[in-house]
């Protein structure tokens, strides 16, 4: 199984990663092309384009200016340990065993507006460039047009190395739009997480994001390799609801949280 997740806006370059092992992103030439476009933006442009504060815009203008391809452990960090946010809280990478981390490197991929597709141990320099950003570039009006088929091709390459054809999509809609499902050489499974609130089960963003990370952790720790095993996910009170599910969209429910 190959697992896809989104990145996070929040980054942590202060806490040391739990390993010194690293790999390099596969699509850096494309990242470099995007950086050249981003360097032409003023902080005011960035604030408007990304809908962020002047402070965050200034920080990211500086990041674009300082970015260079000579990645090392002094100026970059492994992606899985650099991202913080609800998904990554659920995943809790800092406590992964050596075996689970090795499985993550093989079976987990992180979609990225700047880097396209990252393996967990791929080094990355700090950035903010969400996939939905309407950044005009030589290939089109936005990042979806910039990446075109490139991300999908990388996903298919990773799928081919899995030994099966199941892609577990735990990414947000914004990020999964960078993948072309009809071109995926396998079956796409998109788990749905619903929490009970006021007597109804519904997708609550904060809980759903965290649940995606918890499912990644469950799959890595339990060496999940078959669809049936995925349905046994039961972390934090979630349970599979066959009545609410389809084959490609298994639904996991949880009772109201106190």
From Swiss-Prot:
Gene Ontology, cellular component aspect: cytosol
GO terms classed as biological process: response to hydroperoxide
NCBIfam families: PRK02101.1-1, PRK02101.1-3
Family: Belongs to the UPF0246 family.
Family matches, as HAMAP family: UPF0246
Protein name, entry field: UPF0246 protein Shew_1093
């Amino acid at each position: 199984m190959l697992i896809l997740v989104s990145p996070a806006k929040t980054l942590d370059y202060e806490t040391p990663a739990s390993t010194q092992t690293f790999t390099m992103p596969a699509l850096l030439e494309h990242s470099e092309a995007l950086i050249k476009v981003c360097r032409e933006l003023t902080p005011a442009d960035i604030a408007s384009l990304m809908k962020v504060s002047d402070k965050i815009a200034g920080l990211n203008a500086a990041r674009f200016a300082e970015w260079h391809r000579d990645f090392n452990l002094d100026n970059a960090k492994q992606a899985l340990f650099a991202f913080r946010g609800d998904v990554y809280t659920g995943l809790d990478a800092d406590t992964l065993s050596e075996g689970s981390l090795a499985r993550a490197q093989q079976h987990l991929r992180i979609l990225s507006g700047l880097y396209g597709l990252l393996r967990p141990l791929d080094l990355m320099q700090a950035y903010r460039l969400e996939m939905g950003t309407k950044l005009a570039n030589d290939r089109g009006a936005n990042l979806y047009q910039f990446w075109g088929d490139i991300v999908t091709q990388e996903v298919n390459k990773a799928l081919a190395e899995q030994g099966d054809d199941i892609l577990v999509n735990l990414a947000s809609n914004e990020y999964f739009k960078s993948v072309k499902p009809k071109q995926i050489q396998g079956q796409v499974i998109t788990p749905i997480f619903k929490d009970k609130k006021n007597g109804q089960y519904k997708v609550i963003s904060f809980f759903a994001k965290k649940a995606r990370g918890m499912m990644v952790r469950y799959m890595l720790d339990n060496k999940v390799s078959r669809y049936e095993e995925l349905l046994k996910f039961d972390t934090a009170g979630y349970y599979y609801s066959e009545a609410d599910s389809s084959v490609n969209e298994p639904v996991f429910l949880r009772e109201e949280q106190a």
